[in-house]
Amino acid sequence: EHGVERLSADFNCTVRDPAYVNDILDRLKREEPRIHDMMLYVEQPFPYDLEANQIDVHSVSARKPLFMDESAHDWRLVRLGRQLGWTGVALKTCKTQTGALLAACWARAHDMPLMVQDLSNPMLAQIPHVLLAAHVSTIAGVETNSMQFYPDASAPEAAIHPGLYRRHEGCVDLSTIRGSGFGYRLHAINRDLPPPEIEV
């Protein structure tokens, strides 16, 4: 229906007992097998502070891939998550580019699938975000939604990188990214920025 092929379930850190998620997944499998089969993964059902909430989640990840999102602040937490039963990692450049790269490297070295998500990255933030997704193998492309929620915020950048700020058949186009500085092409973007806080 509506051409949907894949789904995910994001509990947004609201669950403390794996049995709750297991029950939902088991009921879906029993009562709505088509929906169950479309579900790629379950995302972050449990509290984001993984160190304070070391919940064994192997029973959930035995049913569906279980992705860390809010908990995946750095590679050390990804390591802890894997020990607890998490099977995948959502990377976000807004948690720092370096942190996302290190988490990606650790996860890849331990056969954990990746996805790249955003928090509605507008303007220049969109560029390193999509570049990360282009260079780490993800399970389903990249989540990018700033053009959906506030399209006008990125108008100066979209004039230079139109394919990055407008989806076409579910895809963004990275072909205009080139040159130094993440390929931003700052000299061509007509955006007034405040003066830097620190001069080096």
Residue ranges of each PLM-predicted region?
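Flexible C-terminal active-site loop/helix
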Residues: 120-200
